[in-house]
A protein has these predicted regions:
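Long, contiguous, compositionally biased segments that the model treats as domain-scale units
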Residues: 1-140
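Glycine-rich, charged/polar anion/phosphate-binding loops
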Residues: 53-55, 275-278, 305, 334-336
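Short coil-to-beta-strand
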Residues: 64-65, 349-351
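Short acidic (Asp/Glu) and glycine-rich catalytic loops that position anionic groups and cofactors
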Residues: 67-73, 283-285, 314-316, 355-360
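Anionic group-transfer/hydrolysis microenvironments
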Residues: 72, 112, 294, 354, ...
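Active-site-facing alpha/beta catalytic cores
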Residues: 76, 81-325, 368, 393-395, ...
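Non-transmembrane, aqueous-exposed alpha-helical and coiled segments at domain scale
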Residues: 302-305, 311, 317-349, 355-410
Length: 449
């Protein structure tokens, strides 16, 4: 399809006539339309120029000259949008990025799964407890978590609350990443504390090398003013069309549509039907976009998604986020890499080592084994090395807090420990320590690359 036709603003609503999945059953659609009209009048959360910069950065990652780090909550909550929680999450990502930058010897693109990750796809529309059946919790943007009829009824006012919470989160992120909080020397000093913990001795070498590198830069007169600020982008799953569509704006410079709710949006595994509403809408916006690919994805599906979403083969436009499961990635990923490589397309390949590795403990906790997460990351790198393509990034669910949601890691969280601090309303996240440990392990893989 010719790009001008594809980016014609009048076609931005073509999705409305197509099959759509995973939307709330709004009790009163007239109110949704009123809220949408109000959202359409709100200022954009991000700017087209920033979105274009991100696309340029992602193009570098797709060609092996940068690495994407994407992380944040499984599902953000309105109550969780506090300064402390946001700061800790940003801090964790910055700490991971320093380690990855050193291990990769190349720039790391920092992106929060933040400031918009309020909607969740569900495997079932309804949830039953005892003899009561209510709508499933679809994230704070749609309904409440409490299991009552009032809480679980989708409320369009939540779309506005999601916008305002995203705006205040983004304001803090911008302040933290531009105001000196992100100073490289400061971030590295936090990491030294991690590496000095006896449980993490194997990472001491890397931390010491980074230390020497920073001292060398200081001695050589490097411009540390430049290193006090970092570029930090936002991304979320673009799921709720009644939120994403009103925040889609026409760029005054080019006359083309941008989704201004985030720099980067992705399509989930459950909503990537080639003839569905989400794929159509995503094909018409200028943002860099992602698609989640599970272990059953066929090479033909991957190629069809490229044709539909990136017909111009534009560098940085399309990211494939693979979520295979540790036991499946070594079989499922290479055929996709081969087929896409042979087609000449060059999407960015990113691993999501979280979503294919869920388990439920006998006590009923949803959890993931840290060893499985690590194994999937290793399988991702192995597949790329075998095929001769670039392992371009990692997508993780994490928090900056000391929660106990995933099993293992140097703190050796076991099933009995999960109950001490399990806070996620959705999927289990890596805690602060596990996230840093993952960064050191990925850095070791990057050094081999």
């Amino acid at each position: 399809m010719h790009s001008t036709a594809r980016l014609d603003p009048s076609a931005l609503d073509a999705w409305r006539s197509l099959p759509i999945k995973q939307q709330p059953e709004w009790p009163d659609y007239a109110e949704v339309e009123r809220v949408s009209a109000e959202l359409a009048q709100q200022p954009p959360l991000v700017f087209a120029g920033e979105v274009d910069s991100l696309k340029d950065r992602l193009a570098q990652a797709a060609s092996g000259r940068a690495f994407l780090l994407q992380g944040g909550d499984c599902a953000e909550t309105f109550a969780g949008a506090t300064a402390d929680k946001i700061r800790n999450r940003v801090k964790t990502l910055l700490q991971m990025a320093v380690v990855l930058t050193y291990g990769a010897s190349m720039p790391v693109i920092k992106m929060g799964r933040m400031a918009g990750q309020f909607a969740k796809p569900r495997s079932s529309d309804m949830e039953t407890r005892g003899d009561v059946t209510l709508p499933a919790y679809r994230g704070d943007i749609a309904n409440g978590y409490d299991f009552t009829a009032v809480s679980r009824t989708p409320d369009p006012q939540r779309l506005l609350k999601a916008y305002h919470t995203s705006a205040s989160t983004l304001n803090l992120i911008r302040a933290f990443t531009q105001g000196g909080f992100a100073d490289l020397r400061e971030v590295h000093s936090w990491n030294k504390g991690f590496a000095e913990n006896p449980a993490n001795q194997r990472y001491e070498r890397l931390a010491a090398e980074i230390d020497r590198a920073i001292k060398f830069m200081e001695a050589a007169g490097a411009d540390f003013d430049e290193l006090k600020r970092v570029e930090f982008y936002t991304g979320h799953e673009g799921l709720l069309m009644d939120y994403e569509r009103p925040l889609t704006r026409i760029d005054s410079r080019t006359g083309t549509p941008y989704n201004t709710s985030a720099h980067f949006v992705w399509i989930g595994e459950r909503t990537r039907d080639l003839d569905g509403a989400h794929v159509d809408y995503f094909s018409r916006i200028r943002n860099p976009i992602g698609v989640k690919l599970g272990p059953t994805t066929s090479p033909d599906t991957a190629l069809a998604l490229i044709d539909k979403l990136d017909p111009e083969r534009e560098p940085g436009r399309l990211t494939f986020i693979t979520r295979m499961g540790a036991g499946k990635i070594r079989d499922a990923l290479p055929p996709l890499l081969e087929a896409v490589k042979d087609s000449g397309a060059k999407p960015l390949w990113v691993t999501d080592p979280m979503h294919g590795n869920g388990i439920t403990t006998p006590t009923g906790y949803k959890t993931r084994r840290f060893d499985d997460v690590i194994d999937e990351v290793r399988g991702f790198f192995e597949a790329h090395r075998a095929v001769g393509t670039f392992p371009g990034g990692i997508h993780v669910e994490l928090t900056g807090d000391d929660v106990t949601e995933c099993l293992g890691g140097s703190e050796q969280i076991d099933e009995a420990t999960l109950a001490t601090r399990y806070e996620s309303l959705c999927d289990p996240r890596l805690n602060h320590m596990q996230s840093l440990e993952l960064a050191f392990l990925v850095a070791e893989e990057l050094e081999k690359r």
